[in-house]
């Protein structure tokens, strides 16, 4: 792949990643970049650009501000006083449905052998020096 094609591919991927519509990035009829296309992609030298990036693309900055970077959840209409910026940590635990039967977990999981997939396949034997010390084995 020659350098021109690799640069075009890189610019295409960057432009699509930042939300530019496909019609603005790549025109199907004309595959060679012109001065107008270079200006729309921001490829001109920094002295040649007429507007800074934030002024040229207000839609992209508006999209970013709509996503929100706040750590607290959106305010609820319950009317409870809440300090701004502080929120209760949400539990990732999934609640059990009503009437669900709880399954008892094994407590001696470290005593099992585990395969490379994280599945247990057998109970570990006692250490070689502990032959006479294990009372439960017959």
Swiss-Prot record:
It comes from the Eukaryota. The modification Phosphotyrosine is found at residue 112. Residues 28-39 have a biased composition (Polar residues). InterPro entries: Metastasis-suppressor_KiSS-1. One of its GO terms (molecular function) is kisspeptin receptor binding. Very high expression in placenta, with the next highest level in testis and moderate levels in pancreas, liver, small intestine and brain at much lower levels. Expression levels increased in both early placentas and molar pregnancies and are reduced in choriocarcinoma cells. Expressed at higher levels in first trimester trophoblasts than at term of gestation, but only expressed in the villous trophoblast. Keywords: Amidation, Cleavage on pair of basic residues, Disease variant, Hypogonadotropic hypogonadism, Phosphoprotein, Secreted, Signal. Disulfide bonds: none annotated. Processed by MMP2 and MMP9. GO terms for biological process: cytoskeleton organization; G protein-coupled receptor signaling pathway; positive regulation of cytosolic calcium ion concentration. Residues 1-19 form the signal peptide. Its main location: secreted. It is found in: Secreted. Residues 77-89 have a biased composition (Low complexity). GO terms for cellular component: extracellular region. Belongs to the KISS1 family. This is Metastasis-suppressor KiSS-1. It comes from Homo sapiens. The gene is KISS1.
